[in-house]
Every structure is written in C-alpha cells, then in structure tokens.
C-alpha cells in the first residue's frame, strides 16, 4: 500500500505488499521489497535498496546506494524471515549496509533514533544501536555488536563480534575493538585500549562538573588504581550509591561477556 501523498519516481520499483507512509519520497532507481514498511516523511534519495522484512520509521534520510535488510553474511543463515528495524530521524549515508538478523542471534538487527551512519559504514546481523550514535566512514560492526546511546565509532574502525560499547564512548579512528568498552571511555588503537574519560562529550550533553568528577573517579578505580576488576567493582558500586551518574558502570559490568578493554 502506497499512501496517496507519497512520491515514487517512475524508475523506482516498489513491490506489491510494501507499506509506504505519508509524504515518503522514493527517488530514482530505488528498489523496495514486498515485506518493507517505510514510515512517514522518510526520504530514499536514489539507488537505495530496502529488502527483506524491514521496518523503517519516520523522517529518515537514506542516501545513494545504501542497502538495508539484505541477506546477512553469516554462513549459518538459511533464508529464515529475520528482520531489520530502524527508528526515526536517522541519516544513513552513501553505501551503508545494514543486514538482517539471524535466528541464532534473536532474528533482529535494530537501529534506534537520531543516528548518523556515514559513508560505507556496515552494521552486521543482530547488531543493536541505541540513539544518537555516529559511525564514521568505513566503520564496521561485526555480528551481534551492541552500541548504547551517544556512541561515536571513528572511521575505519572495526568492532569484534558480540562486543558491547557503553554509552558516551568514543572510539578513535583506525582502531580494532576486541573486548567490551565501558561507558564514558575514550578508546583507541588495535587492540583498543582506554585513554581516559570522554569529558568533552559529557560537557556537551549537559553533565555537571560534579557528575564528571564522579565518573572520572570511577574510571580511576577501574583503570588507574592497580586493582583487579573484581576488586574495583564493589568500590565503584559504592560510589554509585552516592553519585547516580556512576551507575551505568555497574550495570555495564553485569552485561559484559567478553571482558573489558585494558
């Protein structure tokens, strides 16, 4: 079903069964599959392919040669009807690829709201992106990677399968991330190592001086105190009882499965 206010260029192909919302713009030579739903106000510039069981929200901008919902690159995939879900107000630039999930990984690749995926970024099967993340040019997320909110992944950086990247993390360009990165941390290198707290990012997002100081103290306990992780955890948990801004560290430790970058 195509809403009467939507525009579909004469050279575009929209397969029967697709649901195209109000004021959607589908540009030249785009292909939209039968099991695709595109929300109100979303724009497909040109030569965009949206395939599979894919749901795209409102007011997204998707640029030339982006491929969304295509068959993933997991050799175990056997054609199951797995999905991609994309939220609202995302900017998906040229040649970005976002692959459908796998049964083994829960069947869903999910992108939240207000993200920027720059040219040639790759989001593999079963990845989850929060809100307001940035993937710079040629950044690559392997399967099952999870990014919390406000994460920045630098250009040419690769993130290993199943890694978790905490909120407000910034990973520098040309890095290789092989383990989980706790929230608020700046990481760089191959293999990526911690380089301090993302202070400028926290200031821009309205964190108070007191909150940033508490986060830095938690970081010091984790990385500069000489304590093991098991020794640092209870002290960070105690700090979180006095400063709620530290609680994301505690929550992250409970989720981490690959160990932390050191």
From Swiss-Prot:
Query: Is Transferase found in the keyword set?
Result: yes
* Catalytic activity annotation: a (3R)-hydroxyacyl-[ACP] + UDP-N-acetyl-alpha-D-glucosamine = a UDP-3-O-[(3R)-3-hydroxyacyl]-N-acetyl-alpha-D-glucosamine + holo-[ACP]
Q: Would you tell me the protein name for this molecule?
A: Acyl-[acyl-carrier-protein]--UDP-N-acetylglucosamine O-acyltransferase
What metabolic or biological pathway is this protein involved in? Glycolipid biosynthesis; lipid IV(A) biosynthesis; lipid IV(A) from (3R)-3-hydroxytetradecanoyl-[acyl-carrier-protein] and UDP-N-acetyl-alpha-D-glucosamine: step 1/6
Q: What is the lineage of its organism?
A: Bacteria, Pseudomonadati, Pseudomonadota, Gammaproteobacteria, Enterobacterales
Instruction: Tell me which species this is from.
Output: Klebsiella pneumoniae (strain 342)
**InterPro entries on file:** Acetyltransf_C, Acetyltransf_C_sf, Hexapep, Hexapep_transf_CS, Lipid_A_LpxA, Trimer_LpxA-like_sf
Q: What class of enzyme is it?
A: transferase
A Gene Ontology MF term for this entry?
acyl-[acyl-carrier-protein]-UDP-N-acetylglucosamine O-acyltransferase activity
Enumerate the CDD domains for this protein: LbH_UDP-GlcNAc_AT (cd03351)
> Where this protein primarily resides, as one coarse class?
cytoplasm
């Amino acid at each position: 079903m195509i809403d009467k206010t939507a525009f579909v260029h004469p050279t575009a192909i929209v397969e029967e069964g697709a649901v195209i919302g109000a004021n959607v713009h589908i540009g030249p030579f785009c292909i939209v599959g039968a099991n695709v739903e595109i929300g109100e106000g979303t724009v497909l510039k040109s030569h965009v392919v949206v395939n599979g069981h894919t749901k795209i929200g409102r007011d997204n901008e998707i640029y030339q040669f982006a491929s969304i919902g295509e068959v993933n690159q997991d050799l175990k995939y056997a054609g199951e009807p797995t999905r991609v879900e994309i939220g609202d107000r995302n900017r998906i630039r040229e040649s970005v690829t976002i692959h459908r999930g796998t049964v083994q990984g829960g069947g869903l690749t999910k992108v939240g709201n207000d993200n920027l995926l720059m040219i040639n970024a790759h989001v593999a099967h079963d990845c989850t992106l929060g809100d307001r993340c940035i993937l710079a040019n040629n950044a690559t997320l392997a399967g099952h990677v999870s990014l919390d909110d406000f994460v920045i992944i630098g250009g040419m950086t690769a993130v290993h399968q199943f890694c978790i990247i905490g909120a407000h993390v910034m990973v520098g360009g040309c890095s290789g991330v092989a383990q989980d990165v706790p929230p608020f941390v700046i990481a760089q290198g191959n293999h990526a190592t911690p380089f301090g707290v993302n202070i400028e990012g926290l200031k821009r997002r309205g964190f108070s001086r007191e909150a940033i100081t508490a986060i830095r103290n938690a970081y010091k306990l984790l990385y500069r105190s000489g304590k093991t992780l098991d020794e640092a955890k209870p002290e960070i948990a105690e700090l979180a009882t006095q400063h709620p801004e530290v609680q994301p560290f505690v929550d992250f430790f409970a989720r981490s499965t690959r160990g932390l970058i050191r």
